[in-house]
Swiss-Prot record:
Residues 24-98 are annotated as: Disordered. It comes from the Eukaryota. The gene is Spata32. The lineage of its organism: Eukaryota, Metazoa, Chordata, Craniata, Vertebrata. This is Spermatogenesis-associated protein 32. Interacts with syntaxin-1 and ACTB. Residues 48-60 have a biased composition (Basic and acidic residues). Disulfide bonds: none annotated. The modification Phosphoserine is found at S135, S138. Residues 37-47 have a biased composition (Acidic residues).
């Protein structure tokens, strides 16, 4: 029992160990050989399978990459050319339409505000100031056609833009191509008178005092209360028709020619204060169009006692004032 060593266990000798190792090596070689044969058989089976049926799972390194690349260009070919054209042109057309519709709207907001004032009345006849005048050639024709004495220089609404009194003594600025300008004060006074006349809040005598004025006194009247800085270019409408004055034979005494007072001037200009700094530098471009309505029956044309001379009920005067007020941009002091 006390002897120890390799010889004590004959089964664990060198020869036996070598034999065991050789057997294990032989077993390993044999197992490796059979494994290689199995792999060869598997590859042969896999090579035969694609001929009959595609494999359910394909190696990702071989199959999917070329198949996806080939299928991508085939997808658009399934769609018809009509759907391709619709999908290609819908989005750009919508974008262009939106850009075109929003762009002028933004320019209008930045450039100024457009206002249109339609007025209709059948009871009032408006009288204009001497400074409201038409273009030079229209003025000459109006003076030749409707020649009046200096005492009857007050003109009706039918002659607001076709006839006026004598021009000021100072030589006007020569503008051969463009018509003469209409002042901002004149347009405001005229529009204010129309606004007052269209409402029933003010009595007719006061309205008559506001709108009427003699030419002799109006020449000496100062307009510093609404002196314009920028003139308004008047575009004379071709559709304007002259309304014949039905009471030219009436004596001038029946027409109350009264000059403008400071009170009435302030009321006329109260609708838009031109003395403000912003409006003094603003640019206003406007156009006034008169439309003559069809003549009604003689029974409806009988004048009322409370109406201003020169108009008859049933034959209203229609006009449209369209103007644009542009505020100047602030100047930068660089």
């Amino acid at each position: 029992m006390g002897v120890t060593g390799i010889s004590t266990f004959p089964c664990c000798g060198k020869d036996s160990v070598d034999i065991v190792e050789r057997q294990s090596d032989h077993h390993r070689h044999h197992h490796h050989h059979t494994h290689e044969e199995n792999e060869d058989e598997d590859t042969e089976v896999e090579a035969e399978l694609p001929r009959t049926e595609p494999p359910p799972k394909v190696d990702p390194e071989l199959g999917p990459v070329p198949q996806l690349e080939e299928m991508e260009p085939e997808l658009p070919s399934k769609t018809t050319p009509e759907t391709e054209g619709d999908s290609y042109t819908e989005s750009p057309e919508q974008q262009n339409y939106r850009m075109e519709s929003l762009k002028p709207y933004e320019e209008e907001e930045m450039g100024g505000r457009y206002r249109s004032i339609p007025v209709q009345t059948s009871k009032h006849l408006f009288w204009s100031n001497k400074l409201i005048q038409a273009s030079e050639h229209s003025l000459q024709k109006a003076l030749e056609k409707h020649h009046r004495s200096p005492q009857e220089k007050s003109i009706s609404i039918s002659q607001v833009y076709t006839e006026c009194t004598q021009p000021p003594s100072s030589p006007p600025v020569s503008r051969p191509t463009t018509p003469t300008a209409i002042g901002l004060a004149d347009l405001i006074n005229f529009a204010s008178s129309l606004a007052v006349a269209s409402s029933s809040n003010m009595a007719l005598p006061n309205l008559e005092n506001m709108i009427k004025g003699t030419s002799e006194k109006s020449q000496n009247t100062s307009l510093d209360f609404c002196q314009p800085v920028q003139a308004i270019k008047f575009a004379q409408a071709t559709q304007i028709t002259q309304i014949s004055s039905e009471k030219q034979d009436e004596s001038p005494k029946s027409m109350a020619h009264k000059s403008w007072t400071r009170e009435t001037r302030n009321v006329a200009c109260s609708y838009l204060d031109i003395n403000q700094a912003g409006l003094k530098t603003a640019t206003i471009q406007g156009e006034v169009k008169f439309v003559q309505t069809p003549i009604a029956s003689p029974q409806l044309q009988e004048a009322k006692e409370d109406s201003v001379p020169g108009t008859k009920k049933g034959n209203p005067l229609l006009l449209k004032i369209h103007f644009k007020l542009s505020s100047p941009q602030p100047q930068r002091n660089d």
